[in-house]
Amino acid sequence: MVWTWMIALYLFLAGMGAGAFVLSGIAGMAKKPCPKIKMIGFIAGPVCVAVGTLLLVVDAHAGLMNPLRFFYLVSNLGSVMAWGVIILTLFIVVAAIDAIIMVVKKSTPRVLDIIGMVLAVCVAAYTGVLLGDASVAFPLWHPIILPVLFLVSAASTGFALVLVIAHGKAHDEIANIGFTVRSGMVLPVLEALLVIALLGTVAITGGSAAAAAKASVANLLTGGYALAFWVLFIIVGLAFPFVQALHKSMQEKKSLMQQPGLTIAGEVGVLIGGFMLRYLIVMAAIPVALG
């Protein structure tokens, strides 16, 4: 595996697509029907994951570049990559079938929705597991904290993607999924706590990985990636969306309908922060010195 910005983009697209599908699945089960929002996530979800998977295959120097090597990777069930491709493929297939049924019949079997949502959660967690599998070489990629962090971030970015599109295509249904206002306050806090836990845990790493661990944390907090970390991730990606969601929770619904620009800005901030989280985690990681 070659760790580049393309991997960061895959991690972002896969997580966002999975989160979008889950939100739309929940919207489809809401007391008040949200068929437009459900349609948005059921189409955007598998498309994002499919594009991300293509990037993963290409960046792994397989697929179009080396199909035989790719088939070897997939057939090796002892590798994290193989199980990841299986999970990704299953999700894309199930989600695509769900989307087609939704387009044709305007409704979908609840069992199929639930299967798709479970697979979506697995996809979101796998984006962290993929990096965590290399934690021996890259101590920043903690095998336990990172999957949870990416899962929470997937929910944030997936919800944000659906809401941004919904403001143009399903504005009348947004009020029916009011829980997204609460999630807009809770998820950034959870993300921040998990980032603190990740950096704190990595910073106290001992043994031969200690130097690489401390250098990785410093890279983010005070080093070459500090500006992007503090401005684009912390301020734009977490603090601004949290404040915007808090403000939204204190406004009346009528007032909210008149401020779509502020709401959309908050969701775009979430998307920027979601990509920057993955980009920074990938690019700022310092490998353990060999020998």
Residue ranges of model-derived segments:
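Membrane helical hairpin/interfacial module
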Residues: 16-94
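Short, strongly hydrophobic alpha-helical membrane anchors
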Residues: 1-5, 290-291
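Hydrophobic alpha-helical transmembrane segments
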Residues: 259-265
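Long, contiguous internal "core" modules enriched in hydrophobic/ aromatic residues
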Residues: 4-5, 11-13, 31-33, 39, ...
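Juxtamembrane boundary at the C-terminal end of a transmembrane helix
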Residues: 275-291
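Selective recognition of specific alpha-helical transmembrane segments in multi-pass small-molecule
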Residues: 46-54, 188-198, 277, 281
